[in-house]
Amino acid sequence: MEFVTALVNLQEESSCPICLEYLKDPVTINCGHNFCRSCLSVSWKDLDDTFPCPVCRFCFPYKSFRRNPQLRNLTEIAKQLQIRRSKRKRQKENAMCEKHNQFLTLFCVKDLEILCTQCSFSTKHQKHYICPIKKAASYHREILEGSLEPLRNNIERVEKVIILQGSKSVELKKKVEYKREEINSEFEQIRLFLQNEQEMILRQIQDEEMNILAKLNENLVELSDYVSTLKHLLREVEGKSVQSNLELLTQAKSMHHKYQNLKCPELFSFRLTKYGFSLPPQYSGLDRIIKPFQVDVILDLNTAHPQLLVSEDRKAVRYERKKRNICYDPRRFYVCPAVLGSQRFSSGRHYWEVEVGNKPKWILGVCQDCLLRNWQDQPSVLGGFWAIGRYMKSGYVASGPKTTQLLPVVKPSKIGIFLDYELGDLSFYNMNDRSILYTFNDCFTEAVWPYFYTGTDSEPLKICSVSDSER
């Protein structure tokens, strides 16, 4: 009954609402109803302004329909199912050979076909083993009965597997909970460590402030005393100046001696201590936080300055004095020895590392495509550029909307770069002591490319691959 109901429903869905026959070349209109193409064309034949659906009457401003090959295939399936069902029904009711109109009493073992007597003599079944239906049915019934036990065993085995797999969900939940607690604990340790570091550094700054303030006040007292002495001397000099010549010259030696022995206290100057910290290895969350976003950056040959030599794997670049003859490209750097990465970033978070070694000059960062290609050095006053670099005269500098002097505690030989496009953050890490060098907070309005400036020495810049960075 369920098969019959399903077949009836399939036939209804495969019928055209206009001609009530099986759909021929079915088409679908925008409201979702289906029709024969010819029926819909006739229905809309004399219409100009509006074209209503023949079923729901929803009107469209223009003729619009699309062919539905999937529905055409389903319609053909519905036809075949109806034909087969009718054929089976007749066979079941009559058990007669449709070809010879004789009772079906025999069975071809090789072809697995039910035959009448006349069919068994046909050339198709010559030399085939043919037996009575009763015997063939008994044989196949034994085969089916023999397969019952293996089927039951298979069901039992799979049910045990289901129970086992079900228990794995409990195991998974426990492991996930353990991992969650482990991560929470680790990050709590990092948070506490950072909090303690912050409090300690703030105390040090406060102590230093009080110490400097005390010395500054002491210096102010010395200067005030010096001013008082000068004022007293001034009054004394003014009194001596009106004395007689003899009295003035008698005391001239002591006055000169007193004036010459006056010394102005040195001005007190101060410089705050450079404070910083780096996460110890046991608390270092840097890998866990940013390494999952690591990308394999490769260099774009079409942007490389003519005097830059890019390695075969496009992971390293160095400057050479010999200038190569290469095709012009508007995105190529022709004045400064620079090159871009081949992958642009317009969303998401990305991390890559670059070995700078002991190069005397280098610049790393990101830039927008609007960056000018004809400037001599780093474009500190231009927009669309965020980078840090080392300069032979000015040391380490962050260049972007403004220029900032950097004072790394440890000289970096490998730089980590982390870009959070949506947040507008670009952070640079000194991978030697795992400290942060600088972070830009901006709003990226266009896609950005990794940027590499080599300087004019022969030492290369090397982009670390993912496998190298994980070591």
UniProtKB/Swiss-Prot annotation:
A zinc finger (RING-type) spans 16-57. A zinc finger (B box-type) spans 92-133. Pfam families: PRY (PF13765), SPRY (PF00622), zf-B_box (PF00643), zf-C3HC4_4 (PF15227). Residues 171-223 form a coiled coil. Keywords: Coiled coil, Metal-binding, Zinc, Zinc-finger. Residues 277-470 form the B30.2/SPRY domain. The keyword Metal-binding applies. GO terms for molecular function: SUMO-ubiquitin ligase activity; ubiquitin protein ligase activity; zinc ion binding. PROSITE patterns: B302_SPRY (PS50188), ZF_BBOX (PS50119), ZF_RING_1 (PS00518), ZF_RING_2 (PS50089). GO terms for biological process: innate immune response; negative regulation of non-canonical NF-kappaB signal transduction; regulation of gene expression. GO terms for cellular component: cytoplasm. PANTHER family: E3 UBIQUITIN-PROTEIN LIGASE TRIM. E3 SUMO-protein ligase that mediates SUMOylation of TAB2 leading to inhibition of NF-kappa-B and MAPK pathways by suppressing the TRAF6/TAB2/TAK1 complex. Belongs to the TRIM/RBCC family. This is Tripartite motif-containing protein 60. It comes from Homo sapiens.
